[in-house]
Amino acid sequence: MRLNKMTGRVIATMGIAAMMMTQTAGVMAAEQTENKQLKVVYYNQADYPGKKIGGSTIQAAGCGPTAVAVCYSSLTGKKADVPKMCKQAYKHGWYYTGQGCSHSVVPGLSKLYGMQCKGLGMDKDAVEKALRAGHPVVALMGPGDFTKNGHFVVLTRMVGKDKVKIADVGSRARTAETWSLKKVIRQGKEGANAGGPFWEISVKAGRTRL
């Protein structure tokens, strides 16, 4: 059977449209894969009045364990016992009275609670890649918007091309804000050890809440 020119053009147009729809769907699927969003469970240090970590209180010096607790509950869906995590930090020598938690508290507690921890140093690209994969990133912040000395927070997801959401375990107000990733990286604690000041936290495949 012979097709006239008009029919041929219609079929060709339909074919091109179908191809474009397929390509668009592929791009959308890729974007969704590259921008997984973590279901964040938030904890705040001030929610444990009077609870101790070493010779101090969780509210004053428990940001490290509380940040790891955010990662644990967000990734596994299980409730974290923040005071118990703080006791574990002290028991294992990751807390120094009068000084706060050591940088090793992040990989140490992560391993203790069955999570994987990867030190990212100050690598902005690695931090962004981790967040787009749905992995929280614990950050040890230096002097700036978050602290005058040192403070652990959790980067939870990318917003658009270069912004980030943060679970600040010491401030609900800062948690509600959206931050420049470049600015956050610049304010990372200089001289951090144990792979810091940024650590990617994850769990084995099949155990996440994504």
Describe the predicted segments one by one.
Residues 48, 70, 77, 91-96, ...:
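Solvent-exposed loop/turn segments at secondary-structure junctions
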Residues 9, 24-96, 178:
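Active-site-adjacent structural segments surrounding the nucleophilic cysteine of cysteine proteases
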Residues 158-210:
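Noncatalytic regulatory segments and standalone regulatory/sensor domains
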Residues 87-122:
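Mid-length scaffold segments of soluble, non-membrane domains
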Residues 116-169:
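Active-site-adjacent substructure of cysteine-protease-like catalytic cores
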Residues 67, 71-76, 89, 93, ...:
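Sec/Tat-exported extracytoplasmic proteins
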Residues 59, 64-71, 81, 85, ...:
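Stable alpha-helical elements in mature extracytoplasmic
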Residues 1-30:
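Gram-positive cell-envelope targeting signals
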